Design a protein with these regions (language model features):
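Active-site-lining helix/loop region of Rossmann-like oxidoreductase modules
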Residues: 1-107
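C-terminal active-site/capping subdomain that shapes the small-molecule cofactor and substrate pocket
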Residues: 72-181
């Protein structure tokens, strides 16, 4: 879930302008996006490849494999969202071996640059708006995947102008790998 700042200042300005026009119930023309970005989510960032993935999605997949291991299975759908700053990821990680949720949480709490905010209640997580201007990568909504006993789901958010979204996921995976050695 990539903010418009990932597309540059002109795109940030366009979101602000489109929001004003939408609130005034006026016609909106998109210049930097394929569709209206104000009050919308666009599941398309960069050019499409023949396989249906976009260049941005393939970049995320390939960077993860390059840093971790080429055998790591990764898929992604990149979505441009009407937020000025900060990217977010909904991540599912499948482990080879059994794990405890407490061990994963402890590992993440001790990972450099990460801050766990995982209160299982309304508002007990960090949003893109709250992450803007902060150096940490925030990890929330840590839970076991109820469809796969060897997997977890996470919500990861960081200020993309300070840290890259793909880097965050990779650093979390690296921390887990180091803990197994």
């Amino acid at each position: 879930y990539q903010s418009v700042s990932g597309a540059g200042k002109a795109s940030m300005d366009e979101l602000i302008d489109q929001t004003k026009l939408a609130l005034d119930n006026k016609k909106i023309n998109s210049k930097n996006f394929t569709k209206q970005i104000a009050f919308n989510a666009i599941p398309h960032i960069d050019d499409f490849s023949n396989d249906g993935y976009t260049k941005e999605e393939m970049k995320m997949i390939n960077e993860t494999k390059k840093i971790l291991d080429k055998s790591v299975e990764v898929t992604a759908t990149c979505v441009r969202v009407p937020v000025l700053v900060s990217h977010a990821e909904s991540v599912n990680i499948e482990f080879e071996k059994d794990f405890t949720l407490e061990k994963v949480k402890n590992l993440l709490e001790n990972a450099e640059g990460c801050k766990v905010v995982n209160d299982q209640k309304d508002g007990g997580y960090i949003t893109q708006l709250e992450a803007a201007g902060k150096d940490e990568t925030f990890i929330s909504r840590i839970r076991k995947d109820n469809t796969n006993e060897k997997a977890i789901n996470l919500w990861i958010v960081s200020d993309n102008l300070l840290r890259g979204a793909a880097l965050n996921a990779v650093e979390i995976a690296e921390a887990y790998i180091k803990s197994k050695q």
